[in-house]
């Protein structure tokens, strides 16, 4: 009889734990059902990276002094700095600079410790290629400025997702005339400009 009661007690505990696990799992599922989608229809839509996004490195050849600080602070000694010593000026003369983005971990140490700020992180993340050797960028390729997602006319940024009407989850086919939760960046800019103009008018005409 005692063994039977123990089996019943164990069965009840297992059933209770199973129900608890199911509740926890479904609570996460239902919680995500109320959230907005985070996926986009790439490449027709692109997410706008944050201001501190660490994308492809931009390099300015004219500012570089070939100090090789970027090489020393890089965890994998990635940047290749090709220079020669100028005997007349007794200074380093930079010949070539390259970074292999197939190996780069985008930690940003080279950008942070560069004494002349010749390196900077961009918002470019489209580095996919069929040949890994194409990811080895020289100083010419590094010097090209990437296409800004916010000004790229060939794509539709998902910026409006944060300004959808209340209760709308799908950003597609939303009429522009619908009342939105917040103002679009262009509307905020126009409002700030109008406020600035009004202040200037009041300052120029204090009697009005």
UniProtKB/Swiss-Prot annotation:
GO CC, alphabetical: plasma membrane-derived thylakoid membrane
Annotated keywords: 4Fe-4S, Iron, Iron-sulfur, Membrane, Metal-binding, NAD, NADP, Plastoquinone, Quinone, Repeat, Thylakoid, Translocase
Taxonomy, superkingdom: Bacteria
Annotated [4Fe-4S] cluster 2 binding sites: 74, 104, 107, 110
EC primary class: translocase
Co-factor remark: Binds 2 [4Fe-4S] clusters per subunit.
Compartments, record wording: Cellular thylakoid membrane
Annotated [4Fe-4S] cluster 1 binding sites: 64, 67, 70, 114
Membrane topology: Peripheral membrane protein
Gene Ontology biological process terms from the UniProt entry: photosynthesis, light reaction
Recorded catalytic activity of this chain's protein: a plastoquinone + NADH + (n+1) H(+)(in) = a plastoquinol + NAD(+) + n H(+)(out); a plastoquinone + NADPH + (n+1) H(+)(in) = a plastoquinol + NADP(+) + n H(+)(out)
One Pfam family it belongs to: Fer4_7
Cofactor: [4Fe-4S] cluster
GO MF assignments: 4 iron, 4 sulfur cluster binding; iron ion binding; NADH dehydrogenase (ubiquinone) activity; quinone binding
4Fe-4S ferredoxin-type domain mapped to chain residues: 55-84, 95-124
EC number: 7.1.1.-
Oligomeric and partner information: NDH-1 is composed of at least 11 different subunits.
Family affiliation: Belongs to the complex I 23 kDa subunit family.
Function as written in the Swiss-Prot or TrEMBL entry: NDH-1 shuttles electrons from an unknown electron donor, via FMN and iron-sulfur (Fe-S) centers, to quinones in the respiratory and/or the photosynthetic chain. The immediate electron acceptor for the enzyme in this species is believed to be plastoquinone. Couples the redox reaction to proton translocation, and thus conserves the redox energy in a proton gradient.
Listed name of the protein: NAD(P)H-quinone oxidoreductase subunit I
Encoding gene per record: ndhI
